Amino acid sequence: MLAKRIIPCLDVTGGRVVKGVNFVELRDAGDPVEIAARYNAQGADELTFLDITATSDGRDLILPIIESVASQVFIPLTVGGGVRTVEDVRRLLNAGADKTSFNSAAIANPEVINAASDKYGAQCIVVAIDAKRRTAEDEQRMGADGRAAGPGWDVYSHGGRKNTGLDAVQWAAEMARRGAGEILLTSMDRDGTKSGFDLKLTRAVSDAVPVPVIASGGVGSLDDLADGVTLGGADAVLAASIFHYGEFTVGQAKQRMAERGVPVRL
């Protein structure tokens, strides 16, 4: 069994790392370069850097900050937020990223995943999915087949601001078919709440795709990380709040996962 990965996440806006609850109420967590260096030293398996307002603000990639972060870490670095084109992938890889993450752009133009994967390989193309459990009203929504959507999760774009009406599990499967090498799956309902992953969502997507799934959104304890793997079927677990504010270190997280029988790199 392959080692399961622990991935701290840097949500960046205005050149600072922030953390919110349910994608709002953002709170400052510090300088991205300093925080990245800290996680590298703590033994994180990978690092994810998301420019969370690039798409909604219509901004370009913040390459200087990405270059500075990349210079501090010697573990795989995934960069997302405002990634729109195959050319953006090239620019990010040149800036020091190892993987690039598409979200809203893949929804607007799914072909970009085929093109980016064909050119650079599936191993460096991640598709991020921001999923939210359907409300009772959303469940009644009629699909193209004339049937009500029913229970499940919808995909949101533009930093969680816009409901696309796409089914999260079906969308993940389509992205994997088109060449995504990994799915970064965030539960918007759980984001920042510290109430644990949405394990039903994680399991549904993990079972539906042949590529690794990174569970994100809701970690409040070290056992939540282990649950993402053992109950959710995730290949990697991503967390922000519990690491940023010093509640736990990556080393403590790995120790707890190992105690729970999850294979990790210690």
UniProtKB/Swiss-Prot annotation:
Heterodimer of HisH and HisF. This is Imidazole glycerol phosphate synthase subunit HisF. GO terms for molecular function: imidazoleglycerol-phosphate synthase activity; lyase activity. SUPFAM superfamilies: Ribulose-phoshate binding barrel. It comes from Delftia acidovorans (strain DSM 14801 / SPH-1). IGPS catalyzes the conversion of PRFAR and glutamine to IGP, AICAR and glutamate. The HisF subunit catalyzes the cyclization activity that produces IGP and AICAR from PRFAR using the ammonia provided by the HisH subunit. Belongs to the HisA/HisF family. The keyword Cell inner membrane does not apply.
